């Protein structure tokens, strides 16, 4: 019987922390059979970072060069990512527990095709501005889990985290977003536990 692999999309603007999030999560979730697909426009930079820094072997990481608009590769024409998923499935005999699929850095409106992924995480960072949650981008609104990263930078960029929380609560439930600082692992455990409970249904 073929195992049901959960595909988790990870989206967010350039520099928000998508790749670092995957590096942290794959280390913490090493009890599972994991693989990662990264999307970059013209390089495989994120895949190379994970191959060097994560706990995954290189054959568990595929870098997709999307060219053009990264949004298209996760929604309108996701053929390259479908192909990468199938490659990983065949490589590991359809026995993977989770495939994380990281989008290329894109704008606040970027969303994944529901045919491509089962669940989505969208991540922004405080340095992009306190007003980002107020902009109500579809990536934030439609994702299953929303992360606000780099909380340590708030005093330096004049961002009020309480205001960001209030603005986020206009669009999301309290239990579906988490503040993080991935550089020092703040709340990474909470993100992992949220994924295990809500995406992998481990508590059922």
Curated annotation (Swiss-Prot):
It is found in: Cytoplasm. GTP binds at residues 12-19. Keywords: Chaperone, Cytoplasm, GTP-binding, Nickel insertion, Nucleotide-binding. Signal peptide: none annotated. InterPro entries: CobW/HypB/UreG_nucleotide-bd, P-loop_NTPase, UreG. GO terms for molecular function: GTP binding; GTPase activity; nickel cation binding. Pfam families: cobW. GO terms for cellular component: cytoplasm. GO terms for biological process: urea catabolic process. It comes from the Bacteria. Disulfide bonds: none annotated. PANTHER family: UREASE ACCESSORY PROTEIN G. Homodimer. UreD, UreF and UreG form a complex that acts as a GTP-hydrolysis-dependent molecular chaperone, activating the urease apoprotein by helping to assemble the nickel containing metallocenter of UreC. The UreE protein probably delivers the nickel. Belongs to the SIMIBI class G3E GTPase family. UreG subfamily. Facilitates the functional incorporation of the urease nickel metallocenter. This process requires GTP hydrolysis, probably effectuated by UreG. This is Urease accessory protein UreG. It comes from Streptococcus thermophilus (strain ATCC BAA-250 / LMG 18311). The gene is ureG.
